[in-house]
């Protein structure tokens, strides 16, 4: 397995993005987001997704100079227009604003419409936690999953993120697509030549399968919790569209590529009710209870959400970030 130093990955991404119209500062910030995604083990939304984003820039579907702006506000809630800019930077600024509103009011909400793909949603949940806030955020997507009981794709696997801060930086976070596996995870599993650990969707004959390529071909990803994930997807799309005035899943499906997405950023300041120390104590008791569980397998381990990611970051910092050589070489030639 080839590994690349995190700093080298940032440098190469920065170089390519500057060539495609980003200001030097924005190119560096955007490059850090891509590299951190791979550093965190979410390779599908780091290096592996980078060439696709470059193709969108070349087709003019992403405006590297556009910045999201607030177009209306009420109390601690704001509606922003992303102007089809670079999704991760717009989303980052929106969550930063939600956190600032939360520090003032206890809760801050930014509804971001007309944006582009935000890559890894966990970036923004973690950002909120780093600022001492509970972070809740989600995005809609192009139609890429059938509603429960359907064959054709009319809903999105709209990723949902929840993060809880800890003062030692060991934050607790769930970042999950509403399909059993995100399409990025299907891609990375296929590229690694592996099967999924459990069925992740149906093949073209309607049979459950662990073959990621078969699910990518059929487009029939399985909602998490079956009908529950389907219902949750629909409600998240409704709420996001209503609050932002942006595009719903079915509208995004008419654009060809996955652009013009809608995202919601919610930040809550838990120190409005308890000190940092008091909140840490509550969190630590709950996590200790989880860790005290008896593993189902003798060699197994029970982990809290985000624990595995922190280990991956440490390993990749020390050894280098794993890369698919073909994709990495393509970036070097850009």
Stretches with model-predicted labels:
Residues 1-4, 11-29, 35, 43-61, ...:
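Acidic, glycine/proline-rich low-complexity segments that act as flexible tails and inter-domain linkers
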Residues 3-4, 9, 19, 243, ...:
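Catalytic-core signal marking the mid-to-C-terminal active-site face
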Residues 46-99:
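Active-site cofactor/substrate anionic-group-binding motifs, chiefly glycine-
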Residues 77-167:
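A generic, well-ordered mixed alpha/beta core segment in the N-terminal half of proteins
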Residues 145-214:
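Phosphate/diphosphate-binding glycine-rich loops and adjacent basic-rich segments that engage nucleotide
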Residues 155, 159-162, 177, 231-247, ...:
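N-terminal nucleophile
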Residues 183-245, 256-258:
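Small-residue-enriched flexible segments
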